[in-house]
Amino acid sequence: KTIKKVVEMTIDEFSKTNRYDCEFVLVNDGSTDGTYEKIKELAEKYPFVQGVNLLRNFGQHNALMAALHYVRGDYVLGMDDDMQTHPSQIHKLVEKIQEGYDLVYGHYGKKKNSTLKNLSSKLNEVSSRILLGRPKEIVSSNFWIITRKVAEEVIKYDSYNPYIDGIFYRVTHNIGNVEVEHHKREVG
């Protein structure tokens, strides 16, 4: 429902600087609500947009793995289309990764989620620190940027149920955070 809005807002943000070329790899993870038709419309309108249509819902991390097989840029940005992160925040991740990091997560200073959602996020943070070796000072999120080198290493992992952050932590320890604004989820 928001994919067209997010893509066009992101294009607007990138066009303000003229510093970067961008491409979009949009994955429809088995949705039957017309999402892939919207992706095809965007791909017809913009030559730098391509779509991947998964046959069924394989889950967010499998969808991300599928997208990583198609990207070609120096940097790869992961972002949900639920509008919790405004495209105006992308430049913060780009600037931070250019300091020499392999991976940068957007860190939401104040989240606009329910108490239950915030609690489950906290539990995930503690679990990933204990089980996967995530550095204590790093806070993960669904808004991240990685280098091409990291993307190439990540797609070497062949797993039916990948946990993308866990793979990131195995591939690199050169990880940064940058604070970004968090908005109330529009959909999903």
Where are these regions (language model features)?
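Short, well-formed alpha-helical segments that are part of the catalytic scaffolds
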Residues: K1-S15
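A conserved acidic beta->alpha catalytic loop
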Residues: K1, N28-E37, M83-Q84
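Short helix-capping segments at alpha-helix termini
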Residues: F14-Y20, A43-F48
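Hydrophobic helical membrane-anchoring modules
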Residues: E8, D12, Y163-G188
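Acceptor/aglycone-binding surface of glycosyltransferases and processive sugar-polymer synthases
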Residues: E41, Q50-R56, Q60-Y70, Y75, ...
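Short beta-strand/loop segment that forms part of the nucleotide-sugar
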Residues: V7, N18-G30, V52-N53
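Alpha-helical transmission elements in cytosolic ATPase-linked domains
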Residues: K5, M9, G34, K38-E41, ...
